[in-house]
Structures are given as structure tokens and as C-alpha cells.
């Protein structure tokens, strides 16, 4: 009997503004749909200025069969500091939370504890800062926020904004490790692995990829990254 698998993806939408400088949320949704993922973690899903309305409208996402998890704030935002999460039917929310992050500009992370084919899975969506020092502080703040929660398999997903191999980040996340995914930035000629997954104990990646098909190369300055995950043991939390 085949072990259950789950496909998760991360995508920096660049506020649904493509390299052609056109804001086209329908095009962004076309890219998201092509990932064939059950969970999609988004960055820059809202516009920049307060009250930060959604760049990817709720109703458009829901019309495509997505459930938008409740991270939005008053004013119509899809997410928290631009971080949002979409799930397909069959994935249900058990608990969620916001995580404030330190830095030169307002940033935050989101947490969702989800019932999935793998059992209970904790997914943290993040978009770390451009300055290395603050990236490390932000990741440390995320790990502190998770420390007192009941244990379950954990995935950190998002734009880590780190052009290197992530060794310093891995020292902060302790028992987690970065899955070996391909470069995703910049979209026309990707050379940097900014968009990644960090997996906790009990999880492994069976396959991964970067969506290269059009319109992904023009819909954002990032390409979306996906990973197929499975449990390393028969136990599920």
C-alpha cells in the first residue's frame, strides 16, 4: 500500500504584478492552479499600503476551489503582512496563529495546524527580511513562538530571502533541515533558492520542482516551488 503524500507549494506573488508591470490576479491563480498542490503558502498576497487590501481577491481564489485560511485583517487583506495560505477541499484547519517578527519594517509569519492526508501538520508561512541579521532574529522569533505548542510534524515555507546555502538559518532552526529544492529567483533566469521548505523531524521530501511553464515566468519575479512530502514513519500526530 502506498504511503500517503501531500503536495505543498510556496509562491511570492509580488502583489500579483507581473514582469510586464500589469496587476493580473487571474494570471496568478492560473499559476497557482498549475502547481496541483493541496496547500499553497503565499507571500506578498496583499497590497503594500494600509489597510493592505488583498492583491489576490478572496472571491477569485474561492471561485477556483480554494479555501482561504483566516489570516486577514480588517480592510480586506488576504493575509498577515502579506503572508497567506490557500488549501484545497479535504484539508481542514484545526488551529492558527500570527507571529510578530522583529525588523526594520513590519513583518510577520502565519501558523496553521492542518488536518491532512499525513495527519496533523503544522505549516508556518514566512517572508524574511532583506538584512541577514534580521533574518536570523526573525527565524529565532518563529522558533520561540512554536516552542510551547503541542508537537506535530512541522514545515516552514516561504521566501527566506537568503542567497546562500542557508547554513546560518539552519543553525537557528535546530532540528529542522532545508529540503533540496531548485532556484526560483529571478523568474526569467533563476539562480537563487530564496523560496524554500524547512522540514521538521518525521517528514521527508519525495519530489520537488519549480514551475517553469508560462505564465509563471512573467506572473511574478519569483517562480513557485512545490514539494511532495511524506512521513518518515507510520506515525501521524
Q: Residue ranges of each PLM-predicted region?
A:
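Glycosyltransferases and closely related glycan-assembly transferases
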Residues: 57-64
